[in-house]
Amino acid sequence: MTAGSAPPVDYTSLKKNFQPFLSRRVENRSLKSFWDASDISDDVIELAGGMPNERFFPIESMDLKISKVPFNDNPKWHNSFTTAHLDLGSPSELPIARSFQYAETKGLPPLLHFVKDFVSRINRPAFSDETESNWDVILSGGSNDSMFKVFETICDESTTVMIEEFTFTPAMSNVEATGAKVIPIKMNLTFDRESQGIDVEYLTQLLDNWSTGPYKDLNKPRVLYTIATGQNPTGMSVPQWKREKIYQLAQRHDFLIVEDDPYGYLYFPSYNPQEPLENPYHSSDLTTERYLNDFLMKSFLTLDTDARVIRLETFSKIFAPGLRLSFIVANKFLLQKILDLADITTRAPSGTSQAIVYSTIKAMAESNLSSSLSMKEAMFEGWIRWIMQIASKYNHRKNLTLKALYETESYQAGQFTVMEPSAGMFIIIKINWGNFDRPDDLPQQMDILDKFLLKNGVKVVLGYKMAVCPNYSKQNSDFLRLTIAYARDDDQLIEASKRIGSGIKEFFDNYKS
């Protein structure tokens, strides 16, 4: 596929353009089906499918008590609940008799339709035709399952994959399991929101001069994997102008972009040191429309005129990780190949999880349903409002943690710098060596620092452990990653921040270069 070609709006052109990206294993995947999936009339007795009758299920009904507000143990939120009831016959579109049964590999239609509408409203692919028939979504069993299926479909021993130099390392493990080679892409580690994230100049030079560069013995990259918003571990986001440049590079050098976005809805307005606990999410002026248009970073899908972006989303961060429920967005051709893999491996994700998520979203809609909104619109609006409340809580936790870190003696002595995050769950703290030379044995010194932190009663992640190539990132890996997600309450986050400051101070009090 070449830059400037007409957008591929039909399956035939998608197949022509993206067949070369497929793993050699893809051609051997086919489900050897022995059943006839055609519809039968109601008067036919079904003896073909190996499905237990729903009366064999030990659960006949479930009642869900659904929070309207996260952390609603506050007395003022005493009545902030709604409910959902599920039984063998209801809700009519997704009763237990259906959701607990074997189901379509791509996902149960009610939730699948909601998810596609959700993506279309927020990040509609630029290559989409009017009927949205050339792209689709499939549900999957959590982010790692999505990654596994994507990389198994587009990677093999001949593939080179680019990944941000610090990343969620299981993604790298998934790539390497296919035999593909991983190379690190330099990042700008800064709290400047207009320059942070992938170093576009470095990426341009690397690709434009591939034949003479450091990886000239490898095949030219066919894939970029990126956590572009609220990046793990850095909490940084690739600004819009960089996204446009990266997409142009993808066109020029013909590679796919796998955009992993578990944190994208957890946007953080900039920290205000004059009003450290200021939270724009509490503003009465913040509508769902403004949140979507002014707060959220737009997906690479919205730039994707060529259909070369595969987007991964999950319910783990905005609902619950134990559901193991995620979804993949891509052009119809690539998505069918991913679905072919699911057909012979995991099959459908948990129907119980799908039923719980769908019923919860529907209940949120019903509790706020008005005559001006259809159920479809109310479900979208209700779910976005829930996400905004989650984002608001995370933003408060971010502000509280930053304030507590800035008040520590260690920070005020210049022993560390806080890289304020722009989205997500993570904050990184860069260690400042001050009058000391940066140690040659950096990983060992970071391990020693970790022991001082544990001695003070706090556990974090060491930056070098999340490096794609520790040697390549040696000069940038002297940071700590802390998460603001799991702490019980404000007091625990404040205490953890104090302990971090104390641990870093003790480390430097005992440090010998």
UniProtKB/Swiss-Prot annotation:
Cofactor(s) listed in the protein's UniProt record: pyridoxal 5'-phosphate
Q: What else is known?
A: Present with 7700 molecules/cell in log phase SD medium.
- Gene Ontology biological process: aromatic amino acid family catabolic process; aromatic amino acid metabolic process; L-kynurenine catabolic process; L-methionine salvage from methylthioadenosine; L-phenylalanine biosynthetic process; lysine biosynthetic process via aminoadipic acid; tyrosine biosynthetic process
Its induction, per UniProt? By aromatic amino acids in the growth medium. Expression also induced in ARO8 mutants grown on minimal ammonia medium.
Q: Which GO terms describe its molecular function?
A: 2-aminoadipate transaminase activity; aromatic-amino-acid transaminase activity; kynurenine-oxoglutarate transaminase activity; pyridoxal phosphate binding
**Principal place where this protein is found?**
cytoplasm
Q: Please, which domain of life does this record's source organism belong to?
A: Eukaryota
Q: Which residues carry this modification: Phosphoserine?
A: 90, 92
Can you tell me which family this protein belongs to?
Belongs to the class-I pyridoxal-phosphate-dependent aminotransferase family.
Keywords assigned by UniProt, alphabetized? Aminotransferase, Cytoplasm, Phosphoprotein, Pyridoxal phosphate, Transferase
Taxonomic source organism: Saccharomyces cerevisiae (strain ATCC 204508 / S288c)
Give residues annotated as binding pyridoxal 5'-phosphate: 102, 143-144, 232, 263, 314-316, 324
Pfam families noted in UniProt: Aminotran_1_2
Lineage, top ranks: Eukaryota, Fungi, Dikarya, Ascomycota, Saccharomycotina
Q: Which reaction does it catalyse?
A: an aromatic L-alpha-amino acid + 2-oxoglutarate = an aromatic oxo-acid + L-glutamate; an aromatic L-alpha-amino acid + 4-methylsulfanyl-2-oxobutanoate = an aromatic oxo-acid + L-methionine; L-kynurenine + 2-oxoglutarate = kynurenate + L-glutamate + H2O
Q: Which gene encodes it?
A: ARO9
Sequence positions that bind substrate = 232, 481
Q: What class of enzyme is it?
A: transferase
Location(s) in or outside the cell: Cytoplasm
Q: What does this protein do?
A: General aromatic amino acid transaminase involved in several otherwise unrelated metabolic pathways. Mainly involved in tryptophan degradation. Active with phenylalanine, tyrosine and tryptophan as amino donors and with phenylpyruvate, hydroxyphenylpyruvate and pyruvate as amino acceptors. Does not accept glutamate or 2-oxoglutarate as substrates. Also active with methionine, leucine, glutamine and kynurenine.
Its GO CC terms? cytoplasm; nucleus
Q: Write the Enzyme Commission number(s) for this entry.
A: 2.6.1.57, 2.6.1.7
Which InterPro entries does this UniProt record tie to the protein? Aminotransferase_I/II_large (IPR004839), Class-I_PLP-dep_aminotransf (IPR050859), PyrdxlP-dep_Trfase (IPR015424), PyrdxlP-dep_Trfase_major (IPR015421)
Q: What is this protein called?
A: Aromatic amino acid aminotransferase 2
User: Which residues in this protein are found as N6-(pyridoxal phosphate)lysine?
Assistant: 317
Known pathway: Amino-acid biosynthesis; L-methionine biosynthesis via salvage pathway; L-methionine from S-methyl-5-thio-alpha-D-ribose 1-phosphate: step 6/6; Amino-acid degradation; L-kynurenine degradation; kynurenate from L-kynurenine: step 1/2
Q: Which SUPFAM superfamilies match?
A: PLP-dependent transferases (SSF53383)
